[in-house]
A protein has these predicted regions:
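A short, N-terminal "cap"/entry segment at the start of jelly-roll beta-barrel domains
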Residues: 1-47, 131-150
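Conserved catalytic motifs of the protein kinase core domain
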Residues: 48, 70, 112
Length: 150
């Protein structure tokens, strides 16, 4: 596995266990205003990722598709489906939601929030100009087409 964890250290005698200290990490901007991330685990080859996500009040994750199963645990705030088949679905603190491969929606955080999100491969974000990108604004097919998962 080619996974990395920024600022992680191997623990004791087990070099295969990695401790991550998110409090020591800086929030990284995503390509979406008001959406921030701390990558707890990221495999640049497969796209496998676990991210601590922070959303400013009113932040929107635009139209996107979950290429594989996505899992989210809400620590604070609310995650609301703004558009899509589950429009109005609200996930609050202490709640967990997982979404099936191929599910597509627009999400927002009316009051902001902090969540842990787990991805098997990055989501596809659909832009009005026809572009399809990952969360960092990279062309999805160029960045993740090699995974064969989308």
């Amino acid at each position: 596995m080619d996974a990395v964890t920024p600022k992680a250290t191997a623990v004791g005698i087990d070099e295969h266990s990695h401790v991550v200290r998110p409090a020591e990490m800086e929030w990284q901007k995503t390509s979406f205003p008001g959406c921030w991330a701390k990558p707890l685990l990221f495999d640049a080859k497969s796209g496998l990722a676990t991210m601590l996500m922070k959303f400013d009040p009113g932040a929107v994750l635009p139209d996107h598709e979950h290429v594989q199963i996505e899992q989210t645990y809400v620590i604070s705030g609310k995650l609301v489906d703004k558009e899509g088949p589950a429009e109005g679905l609200t996930v609050g603190p202490g709640e967990y939601v997982w979404r099936e491969p191929g599910s597509r929606h627009v999400a927002w955080t009316p009051e902001g929030g902090i969540m842990i999100a787990m991805f098997q491969v990055p989501n596809k974000f659909f832009h009005e100009d026809g572009k399809v990108t990952d969360q960092n604004g990279r062309d999805w097919r160029e960045a993740w087409g090699h995974t064969g998962k989308g």
